[in-house]
Swiss-Prot record:
This is Photosystem I reaction center subunit XI, chloroplastic. It comes from Hordeum vulgare. HAMAP family: PSI_PsaL. SUPFAM superfamilies: Photosystem I reaction center subunit XI, PsaL. The chain crosses the membrane at residues 125-146, 180-202. Residues 41-124, 203-209 are stromal.
């Protein structure tokens, strides 16, 4: 007696095809690869020391203590710079910074300027140094006008990182910054004139002039 044959439905054929389909390469193997190496973290027996850490162990200060910044030699050098000598008036600090800039700018302008091969290269270098000092003075004035308001107290902190009280820096005020800018301009012009006097009036035996 013959049995009836029922053809499979299309959905069953599709499911069986999807179940049997696997990605195969040239050799018929699966394309997925498993890593054959294992990374292990080995704990060192020697104790490690943190070289860079927050100042005073407080991460909320927002500054880091490194072997350079915490060195007594670096602290001594920075404390002797004019910008950090709070006991000196802003006018005198500006004069000191300006003298250094004006004195050192004459040489590069005289030796590398467009008139370096002419008899007036010294005068041209001096005028170039004075011009740059004037431009820097204008920039300092613009910074002071944009950063400080007339009559407001100093924005400098009155506490050190160790908690010691100190007097607020007068440089961080509109009046103090104005004095610093005026001192910088006067010191820069004086330094340039003094360098010209030593190089080309007294005619000292400098190697470069």
């Amino acid at each position: 007696m013959a049995t009836a044959y029922a053809p499979p439905m299309a959905s069953q054929v599709m499911k069986s095809g999807l179940a049997c389909s696997k990605p195969r390469g040239m050799s018929g193997a699966s394309l997925t690869r498993r890593p054959r190496f294992v990374v292990k973290a080995v704990k060192s027996d020697k104790p490690t020391y943190q070289v860079v850490q927050p100042i005073n162990g407080d991460p909320f200060i927002g500054s880091l203590e490194t072997p350079v910044t915490s060195s007594p030699l670096v602290a001594w050098y920075l404390s002797n710079l004019p910008a950090y000598r709070t006991a000196v008036s802003p006018l005198l600090r500006g004069i000191e910074v300006g003298l250094a800039h004006g004195y050192l700018l004459v040489g590069p302008f005289a030796l590398t300027g467009p008139l370096r091969n002419t008899p007036v290269h010294g005068q041209a270098g001096t005028l170039g140094a004075i011009g740059l000092v004037s431009i820097l003075s204008v920039c300092l004035t613009m910074y002071g006008v944009a950063s400080f308001n007339e009559g407001e107290p100093s924005t400098a902190p009155v506490l050190t990182l160790t908690g010691r009280k100190k007097e607020a820096d007068k440089l961080q005020t509109a009046e103090g910054w104005s004095q610093f800018t005026g001192g910088f301009f006067f010191g820069g012009v004086s330094g340039a004139v003094w360098a010209y006097f030593l190089l080309y009036v007294l005619d000292l035996p400098y190697f470069f002039k």
